[in-house]
Amino acid sequence: MILSEALNLLPDTKGCVVILSGGLDSTITMRLAVEKYGAENVSALTFFYGQKQAFEIECAKLSTSMLGVCHKVVDASFLGDISQGFSANVDKNIEMPTIRDVLGDPRPPTYVPNRNMILMSIAAAYAETKNVDTILCGLQSTDEYNYHDTTARWIGKVNDLLSENRIIKIKLIAPFSSLSKYEEIKILQELDGNTDLLANTITCYNPGKNGYSCGKCPSCAERINAFLKLKLKDPAPYNIKITW
């Protein structure tokens, strides 16, 4: 996909709210939004919900600072509280799975119950206060370990609800939903000529105390494979040795 095609994935509107996790997908989504609308017309929301990979919040702060984007961090830690004993994403006593563990699982152990619906609702409230009608997110329906709340159908159902707003018809858009991480990184390369922005991202579900990615979890596996396919070195650090 060329850059002009990627920009056409975003609607022609005055600005947007980006749900920014601090990972690869949402960071490239934000970079594309800045190219389309200008940094002054982009606002980013990051959520803390008790996730093990809370280092990503600091990554989000760094990337928004680099791009000059308004950034808010929302405390949604109640999600982590109610998901104890259920989700490996928030419970320190539940071991993180490898990608082999989750392939074909209709509900991976990293799933946080109704997380995406809750976070999208908060983002919609924020978008309304900003008087913008577009929320961008980095959801991917093509993830090898699929969640029901990342699919095009799910996004369509959310938009059906959002369309009930009588004043601002807010719409949730996942511009990269049908793309691979490989294709996303290529878009960033065309935007910047490099992947330096991704040095301040973390995709890992189980980072070390130093903030480095584990290199073994499902998210790390996908990210590493994308860089290997492009014959590039990931600028983000890992706790295992990788031959790029």
Where are these regions (language model features)?
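A structure-centric signal for secondary-structure junctions around beta-strands
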Residues: 13-14, 198, 214-217
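Glycine-rich nucleotide phosphate-binding loop and flanking beta-alpha elements
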Residues: 143, 227-228
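Short microdomains enriched in Cys/His and/or Lys/Arg
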Residues: 229-244
